[in-house]
Every structure is written in C-alpha cells, then in structure tokens.
UniProtKB/Swiss-Prot annotation:
Official protein name in the record: Evasin P1078
Disulfide bonds: C48-C67, C52-C69, C63-C80
CC per GO annotation: extracellular region
Record's function text: Salivary chemokine-binding protein which binds to host chemokines CXCL1, CXCL2, CXCL3, CXCL5, CXCL6, CXCL11 and CXCL13.
Entry GO MF terms: C-X-C chemokine binding
Amino acid sequence: MAFNTITFLQWAVFVAILFNMNLHSASAGSKGSSAQQSSHDSIKAEFCETNCTMKTGGKWTQCHGGCFCVHVGNETVGRCIKLDGDYDYPSSKHEE
C-alpha cells in the first residue's frame, strides 16, 4: 500500500492539533502568577451607600461622593461604586 499525500497531510494536521492541545492544557493548569502583583499598582472598588435608577427619559440618577453608576445589560437599577487606586485612563486631550 502506497503512502500518499492525503494521508501525510491528515497525519500532519492530527499531530498539530495534539501539539496545540498539549500546549493549551499545560498553560491552563498553571497555578503560578504571570506577573508580580503589587498593592502599589492595585485598584480598590467599593460599593457606595446609594443605588442609581434609570429615569423615564433614559438618563440615570446621579451618584454622589466620587461614585459612578454601574448597571448590567438592560437593567433599570444599578449600583453606585467608587474606584480608588493607581489607575490612569488615557485622555483624548493633549498633555502639556
């Protein structure tokens, strides 16, 4: 029986799939941290005492004390949260 090109390609694809699965399972089972975590660079999220709701016009009620509204999907009730930490959002304005 002759070893043809189609059989060779099928074996090559099979070996590539097995190799890829082996690499994926090895990295997925890793318990180590990919980067050192520092409390200096962390962000702390806290729930505020108030909730926020969507008004009939589609606008949300304001959160106070440095908090902002977070809601899920099409929910009309959300929670006010506050972020505290070392974070820097990119700005579209030119910095001087």
